[in-house]
Amino acid sequence: MSHNDTPANNTNGIADVYADENPCEIAGEDNPPQPYSCFDGEDRAHDKTRIIKWLCYHPKGVPLARTVKALFPDDSEKRISERSYTSTDYNFVSRFLERTGYAVLDSEAGLIEASPTSRAFHLTLESKIPSEHTTNYAKDRAEACAYGMWSLNDVENARLLAKDFTTYLESIHDRRLMLENVDNPDMKLTMPYHTRFNDDRRKAEQWARYNSAWEAADDKYSSGVMVTLTTDPKRYDSIGEMLDGLMDAWQNLHETLNQRYLEGTRLDFIRALEFGGSEKSNHIGLPHLHVCVFGVPYIDHRWLKHYWSSKHAEIVHIHGMNKRGNDSWIMTSGTHAGKSVAGYLGKYLSKTFERIADDPDELREHYQSWSEGGDWANSELWKLALYWATGRQFWASSHDLKDDSRNFDTLQEVPGLGETKLDRLEAHGIQTLSDVRLASVDEIASIDGISESFAEKLKDLVGEPSEFDVFRFEFRGAARYEEMPASWSHARHLGVSACG
């Protein structure tokens, strides 16, 4: 098939893909869009549709507050940054995104940022191209499983999750994201459909960021504490609810530790999320956190146990940490005394990462081989499926331990940009990395609280503008190279070698 031939399976409604208008230009209910079919009959169906469209216009993330200002302002005549909004609308947007899989909410940088997931992009496409079976089916069912299953002790439950995850990987395997310049539809780009679950490069970047966080901790601190925060499954009805409760309880604990030990200064940390599972486990899929807190040599176990029991679970473990030499942290107490902390957490991450980028056919063969009484509980596949279904990260670190030399995905990841600076930048219309790249040093330095030296450092960190900064691109769909419509035959295909 030549690139000028449109495959039969792409002809249904493909022209309608290009007819969407910019949801950013319309506030309130003056011109509500046609609701997506999945919201039919629901309260505020139009608003939910507009939220998804707004997110897809900001693929690298957008502050939650700015989303509410843009879509539900008290006064739509003002610039977005100058608008106000009601707490009712803010809570509506926040809860909608928390309870669905359309965005990942990141609040650890001090500012809640919403980043659209592939599910949101698929929804925008499905609203325009009719299909008997939606691409969200596997993710929807997996999410329902996570919030409907109390454990994965039954091999059939674990297999169901693994099957849906594999189906998702098949749906993006060898496909390319299709992007079109909003102002010049003739300018089209495609790029590989890579996610953290199917890309070896991203897996390597995960390791680089993890090691870099430990190197930053080496440079800044000489002592710390590792705490293991468990979950009491009796308090919850599902794995998904256990996980939500665990992460909320940790965020509250972090704030409490800040007040208790540093009088409000934020403690640096590295944390890893694990799902318990082995042939000896009596609750497969139970989530827990390992958190390494730096700059405090001691946390009172009795106090922490009482605090955690009141929030989430009765059991916590504490291990002291000290540096051995210049660049090695070891545990000084507990059952793992003498072991490398980075190695202890890294061992779990390494096992979890083993299945990333595996061929979907190999994964299917793997989960089909599981049997009751076998060693399936030790598999990393169902664990990856849980990370995917719940949208949770494998590990994370505090803002100041993030690498300041790598390429950033969001402005909130740039070291040195705390909540105050981010708010001041936003007030002057700078919310994204693109905004920084397109602004001059003088423009940034003119903002109250931003020095010229910091503005220069910020510009240096984010790099030079690219065509993605200069032009506004919109996601149009995903397809295999040979299956793209004829109108995409002259698109520029990023990530394609000269030999094809």
UniProtKB/Swiss-Prot annotation:
One of its GO terms (molecular function) is nucleotide binding. InterPro entries: DNA_repair_Rad51/TF_NusA_a-hlx (IPR010995). Gene3D superfamilies: 5' to 3' exonuclease, C-terminal subdomain (1.10.150.20). This is Uncharacterized protein 1. It comes from the Viruses.
